[in-house]
Amino acid sequence: LINLLKELNFPLSGRLHFELTERMPITNWEAAKRNIIFLNDHGYYLKIDDFCCGYNSFLNLINLGLTHVKIDKKFIDTIDHDEESILFAILSACQTAKLEVIAEGVESREQYIKLKELGVRFFQGYLFSKPHTFPLM
């Protein structure tokens, strides 16, 4: 992939982030860690998507040395229903581990304000932009 990006003169080093999804079990931890280090060494980064869902857990963070997590929209939506205790626990653990958090699926100003108050610095969701196809990005 890196060779292809270089061949196409597509300089995304430092800007291109890959996501480890909740449906992707890791069967070879050593190879996964080597690949993550390789990507990081070339300026590309891997983030855990939908953290605390499916296969994505604290075990991935410990074993792979990842630095970013995306909190799934299911947890963000709890803000609107006064059920955010699990979200608070996840954010607290991430902050203690010095992980960057991306709040995924932020749709309201109230969610944004509350998350910002809780120390979240990165956001994704309809409040900011609807999804775009590649040529529009």
Q: Language-model features: where?
A:
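Charged helix-capping and loop-helix junction motifs
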Residues: 1-4, 31-34, 82-89
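Helix C-cap/alpha-to-beta connector motif
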Residues: 3-15, 42, 97
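EAL-family c-di-GMP phosphodiesterase catalytic domain
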Residues: 15, 19-27, 44-137
